[in-house]
């Protein structure tokens, strides 16, 4: 099975699970990046190549079709938030210690934590 086929299959499996939830407000949690604003900014000496493997657009129709309030994703090891079309996209990654801005684990964890209401 190709990477593209696996990605599409994952989106279809998520959609099937969402169908069982019904019309309730939802939080979609994925490891992969599901919004292009969350890939690593280029040019980047390493990620110019790897961005192709970090995320997918196969979830786009899910955000357009279902009551997704929050989308929490990871994989890129940086922290970012974005609100678009009433969906709050969150990337609260802790990352590797070498990627932290400080040497204080408590400070880094507290910076990565996010509160939200659904």
Model-identified regions with their sequence ranges:
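Active-site-proximal loop/helix segment associated with metal-binding centers of metalloenzymes
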Residues: 1-49
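Generic detector of contiguous secondary-structure segments
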Residues: 13, 75-76
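Hydrophobic "anchor" residues on beta-strands that sit immediately upstream
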Residues: 27, 70-71
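Short His-Asn-centered micro-motif
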Residues: 30, 73-74
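Binuclear metal-dependent phosphoesterase catalytic core
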Residues: 40-52, 56-69, 76-118
